[in-house]
Amino acid sequence: MTPVVHCSVGNISLFHIGSFRPSHEIQIRRFRSTERYSRVPSRRLLQPQRAFNLISIYKRSSWSSARRPRTLSAATVGTDVTVEDPNPPPSGETSEESSEDTAPDTAEASEQAEASTSSIPKAGRNIRKSEMPPLNDEDLVPGASFTGKVRSIKPFGVFVDIGAFTEGLVHISRVSDGFVKDISSLFTVGQEVSVRLVEANKETGRISLTMRTGGDYVKPKTETPKAASGGRNTTATTSRGSPRQTRERDEAKSMGETNYVQGQFLDGVVKNSTRAGSFVTLPDGSEGFLPREEEAVALFTLIGHSALEVGQQVRVKVLNVVRGQVTLTMKEGEDDEEDLASLNTQLKQGWSRGTNAFELAFRRNKEISAFLDQREKIIVPDVQEAAVASVGTELDAEVGIEQSPGKEPETGNAESVAIDSSITEVKETDSIAAVEKDSEISKTESVETASSVVISEDDSTVDGKLVEPTASVSATETEIKEDSSEGSVTTEPTEAASTEFVTAVVEESAPTASSVETSEDDSTVDDKLVEPTASVSATEAESKEDSSEGSVASTESVTAVVEESAPVSSVAIEVPAPEASEASAQEIIEDSTTVEGAADDQTVESDSPPPEGVELSSNGAPDSSIAEDKPDEPEESLIVEEVPVTASSESEDKEPAAVPEEVAASSEKTADVAVAGAEASTATATISPALVKQLREATGAGMMDCKKALAESGGDIEKAQEFLRKKGLAAADKRAGRATAEGRIGSYIHDSRIGVLIEVNCETDFVSRGDIFKELVDDLAMQVAACPQVQYISLDDVPEEVMKKETELEMQREDLLSKPEQIRSKIVEGRVKKRLGEYALLEQPFIKNDKVTISEWVKQTIATIGENMKVNRFVRYNLGEGLEKRSQDFAAEVAAQTAAKAPPAAPPKDDKPEETAETEEKKPAVAISAALVKQLRDETGAGMMDCKKALAETGGDIQQAQEFLRKKGLSSADKKSSRLTAEGLIGAYIHDNRIGCMIEINSETDFVARNEKFKELVNDLAMQVVACPQVEYVSIEDIPESVVIKEKEIEMQREDLQSKPENIREKIVEGRISKRLGVLALLEQPFIKDDSKTVKDLVKETIATLGENIKVRRFTRYTLGEN
């Protein structure tokens, strides 16, 4: 219940703040009548029941503070404020009656309240006091600059007083052009700043300011008229949603609105392109989506690239409109096929399907290529009708000939040519399709159509093919008549050619095709077999002469038998791409007679008693064969390559026996050319770009030089390298700079006496950098160091001869004799595996956990990381292994040295005092200070007495003293080089975990091996090996004699030596060999830290400094991923 406090001037009601909604805004609610009123009966003693709100409500977020009271005071001045009864009357009549009764009194009270409120100032917010000059509303123009003072600093910005109706806010994003982290560090209260106006809204009482240099102010909004009653704007009350909700509603309204209809053509500009399609800007500024599959050029869709570019003008059609989103297309339906055809024509320009150099050369000529492409266009239906008509005419003629067997042909000695080219392709329709080409085209091109019959212009002979409707047997009757060529002897026009017998047997129902072409001027037969899916049995054609009757059979039926029960159908027409060979291209230019194509079997026979023929083998060479006299027996052969063979025709008046010999001779000549071209094309085809790249990386030679070298060497990399070296184009055995495998190279050195270098591979570089993989490599290296018997990685790496030897030894053991024969092999296998397992690393128990083997531990690591890992290789060094240490007897050595020095010291007794006297007289001449000796000792590392003596000899000159000590040290080093070195150090250097080296350097005693100078030498030489990938040997003496001989032979064959005199060639070769071999030797390399001296000089200087012999014994270098 709300309490009411009565006072002399009015009533004060107290409201609890919990009844109000918290807000950060300041709202002023003016007078608002809540209900209608009427006259009030005079019997009422209290003030009229008038409910009105003349309440100034101030709600701020700071009211939630605990310091302020939790009540809200609402007061009215100059009038009485009453609160409606919390228990209103239940009946509506009473309320109406009371309202009517109180109406006149309420009106009077309201008049008095208005008079009082007009005379007394309103209670509200205090007027802000500004220290800046006042500004008019007309001055508040966006972009205008003002000077103000900072009034307060907030985390989100600063409030600045510019003298306007309120303080302006400079947001933290507008304080500076850059990023502002702490705004309090930039401003202080009272600081004068220069700002620019962004926006001033007097309705909301807000001013936005900026201190940025850019123009980020906005245009002022147009004021909307207020409500006549003095309340809030009607538009503000109607839209109570947030700006985001309002924007979503506006977008939803405009989503379904569009000005386009389906099927409308538009011109647009490509805005951008994605994998799914392209976005096109339409004329009204909206965007439409063009899917990739709806582009006009569909070919690029197949390979995943679009033909459209950003900014390109396109002509599109509206495919559909869904919820305001327009989907476009560039396809017009009927024009798609034409677009694809034109695209294929453009793409085929400059492209050839030829397999040899001659065809490629012709195809590069635009005129010849256009002519050849034009000839491919063949009208199939007209040719089919002509071929069917000609077949019917030929069949009638054949029937007439068979009815008159007594009539003999005019030419008794007729030749028979059997050609294996009549193979039919079985389809589902019962029709015959044949393709006719004119004779002019048949001169210059090989057979392009499969399953076609080409008829000459004189129509003297017709190739007919008959397919019976029973669809089980197809009968084909073919007659070939040869016209005399220009270079041959012509015959009488009335002379008739003998009839040839052709029997074609197709053993399978697979689609096949053949063509027989007879030209006008040539007697050539172009035969081409196309077999895409199944094997085709050979056909055999024979000519049989009946000498006993004295006549030659004019015609016999020619049948083609299909052994399968599949329905026999039409002969389909295929137009494959022309494949011209080297020989055929040359024949085209010369207009000579050609026979092209490769059938399964082709036999040319004569009517002589032993019939001979020419048969094409797989490489195109002619083989003579004797045909059998059984015309009905088919002969099997294989499908061979299409190797063109040319053969000149023979005139009809020549002797039949001479025909096969001349044909065979011509075929052999042409076959040699074809074989040579085939070998050249095969050699060229085997040289792949990958092979050229490999040779180029290995030698550093040019690309064309590498290609030529591979062609000369038949694709052999080693021979190609020798060829390049003979030409002086590359340095042999150059290694590739990069390897492909990932992984890590690790090392483990135990007490500088046992060393291990190991390479472990993984799949990715990310895993190789992980801690788990690093730990694996280090543990495996330690495992190898702890197992001296380990020689192999796994049992699979054990050589076969070792396995056989162990198996033989186990089979000879006596305890196996009592075992059954069946289980002996298993017992032996188990023993051999256990025996050889001691030499395999993966079979060893892990040194950190002997319950698992190395193999199991690697598998666990693979399961943890999720990548495959493999131990590729390792090497293990034991210091001094293979060297014999001599027993040192110091007493004997001293006695031997004394005995060796005594005899030479005895003779010069008389001269010695004079020399010593002279030296004693010379010594005081040069004053050698201790500081000079110390300086020389620090620079050279020599002994104190040696430095003093060197300075005395050189007169105190430091540089000459250093040269003196160096010469003396080198001479002493040469003398000490013959001493045995069995001690020393094993060192390793790993560069970026991808290149590693392990090296062993020996010294005479372990005392020198522990010296810091010696350790530094070992580390420097290990780094030297890593920096020189071409180094393979320690010194030139370690290079095998076979390598030296081979290098000498290569150098002697170099072309630049041929012009040199004989007497100096040998010296030039020796110099080149020494230089070449010096690249392979470590001691001949320039030192990486000082290239003025070689590694050999560095070792000698160390020998002179330490006083013992030092020898580089061996080293091993690993590169990650190399074979």
UniProtKB/Swiss-Prot annotation:
Principal cellular location given in the protein's record: plastid
Location(s) in or outside the cell: Plastid, Chloroplast
Which portions of the sequence form the region Disordered?
68-141, 213-258, 443-670, 894-923
Q: Name one GO molecular function term.
A: translation elongation factor binding
- Extract the Pfam families matched here: EF_TS (PF00889), S1 (PF00575)
Q: Where is the composition biased (Basic and acidic residues)?
A: 245-254, 908-923
* Biased composition regions of type Low complexity, renumbered to the chain: 106-119, 551-587, 657-670, 894-903
* PANTHER family, per the entry: ELONGATION FACTOR TS, POLYPROTEIN OF EF-TS, CHLOROPLASTIC
What is the protein name stated in its UniProt record? Answer: Polyprotein of EF-Ts, chloroplastic
Provenance organism: Oryza sativa subsp. japonica (Rice)
